[in-house]
């Protein structure tokens, strides 16, 4: 994705906007969601803004997608005994509001009406 305005996630990665970082390496950053829908709600975000959604990421860089999933698993292992939901919203009608691919790691009881079981 190439735009003149960086996404909010790119601004977090650049440390222009504060966030609670729970994991980071050279390829991804994981932050606490600012409006959590479950006791554990972490966003895992690739540091590249090249991909708008998970289907673009899977086609363009499957190794980065695998790394993102492995990072999600590590977070779930540390915070939720390894049990978690991994959610990618793809498209505005599906609830995607930031068009910089990211995964939601959710664990524990979800807020009512958040997701189908």
Predicted regions and their residues:
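HIT superfamily nucleotide-processing domains
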Residues: 1-117
């Amino acid at each position: 994705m190439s735009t003149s305005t960086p996404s909010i996630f790119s601004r977090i990665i650049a440390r222009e906007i504060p966030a609670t970082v729970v994991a980071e390496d050279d390829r991804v950053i994981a932050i606490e969601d600012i409006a959590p829908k479950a006791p554990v709600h972490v966003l895992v975000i690739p540091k590249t803004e090249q991909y708008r959604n998970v289907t673009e990421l899977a086609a363009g860089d499957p190794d980065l997608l695998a790394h993102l999933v492995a990072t999600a698993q590590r977070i779930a292992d540390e915070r939720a005994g390894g049990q978690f939901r991994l959610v990618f919203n793809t498209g505005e009608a599906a609830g995607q509001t930031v068009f910089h691919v990211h995964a939601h790691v959710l664990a524990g009881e979800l807020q009512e009406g958040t997701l189908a079981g």
